[in-house]
Amino acid sequence: MDIITGSMTALITPFKNGKVDLQKYESLIKRQIAQGINAVSPVGTTGESATLSHKEHKECIEVAVATCKNSGVKVLAGAGSNATHEACDIAKFAQEVGADGILSIAPYYNKPTQEGLYQHYKAIANSVELPLMLYNVPGRTGVDLLPETAIRLFDDVKNIYGIKEATGSLERATSLMSARKDFVVVSGDDSVDFPMLASGARGIISVTSNLLPNLKSKLVSSVLEGDYKTSLSIHNDLYELNKTLFCESNPIPIKAAMYLSGLLDSLEFRLPLTNPSAETMQKLEKILIKYEVIK
């Protein structure tokens, strides 16, 4: 099984006049490819998947696959839903169009038991042959995929290979990695990327890399090559930016930052997400000037 690790970007989804701007989406992915990212992950939390139709969800995956074809950059397609059959449908589509793997968030709102989470993920993984990465972010889903459940899935289901751990807990990450040496953990929280990597994580799925893919790629490649000093320096340098990019609910600040830096032509969200406050826009402009992203 060809697993997906390294520097990965949780792609934003651009809108134009209320519709997904697939042309802009393609150009954003091409920029990721040019700046050294290892993989892109379309239609996850940062991609506003919860407010996309199934048709739009699939269109984004298809564009990502087509854009990354023959580039060496892999596509870890978002295939999460709180309805298991819907997640299976998206996963099957991703496989059909040529995605390299599946990233599936824990089902939100339903609050399933650990057995329910186990059966949910087992069903998705068994519906495809692609490698599947679990995704745990209890602060957004209302349910915590516990380490023992994640390891049970890894042991029982051949194509489940790891987890995007977005609790920000180094203890949680260490407990997972110590349980099974081959179980892949990647950081899902920009604020702890270096500590996670230094502790044995095999990569990151980053929000900040939408804006600075070259630096986030360098952060990961450096530590994986044993150059901890360079990686730590980049991580610490990005601290203030990372903090500002999460001053409101993700992906509001990152899309605003991309708009201010000229990467997006319009700043649009779908309700219930709204544009950032004037105060946040001022914070973002100030930090982007400081980091020389804009003048």
Swiss-Prot record:
It is found in: Cytoplasm. One of its GO terms (molecular function) is 4-hydroxy-tetrahydrodipicolinate synthase activity. SUPFAM superfamilies: Aldolase. Its main location: cytoplasm. It is an enzyme of class 4 (lyase). GO terms for biological process: diaminopimelate biosynthetic process; lysine biosynthetic process via diaminopimelate. Pathway: Amino-acid biosynthesis; L-lysine biosynthesis via DAP pathway; (S)-tetrahydrodipicolinate from L-aspartate: step 3/4. It holds the Pfam family DHDPS. It comes from the Bacteria. The active site is at Y135, K164. The keyword Lyase applies. Pyruvate binds at T46, I205. InterPro entries: Aldolase_TIM, DapA, DapA-like, Schiff_base-form_aldolases_AS. The keyword Iron-sulfur does not apply. The record marks T45, Y109 as: Part of a proton relay during catalysis. GO terms for cellular component: cytosol. It catalyses: L-aspartate 4-semialdehyde + pyruvate = (2S,4S)-4-hydroxy-2,3,4,5-tetrahydrodipicolinate + H2O + H(+). Its EC number is 4.3.3.7. Catalyzes the condensation of (S)-aspartate-beta-semialdehyde [(S)-ASA] and pyruvate to 4-hydroxy-tetrahydrodipicolinate (HTPA). Homotetramer; dimer of dimers. Belongs to the DapA family. This is 4-hydroxy-tetrahydrodipicolinate synthase. It comes from Aliarcobacter butzleri (strain RM4018). The lineage of its organism: Bacteria, Pseudomonadati, Campylobacterota, Epsilonproteobacteria, Campylobacterales.
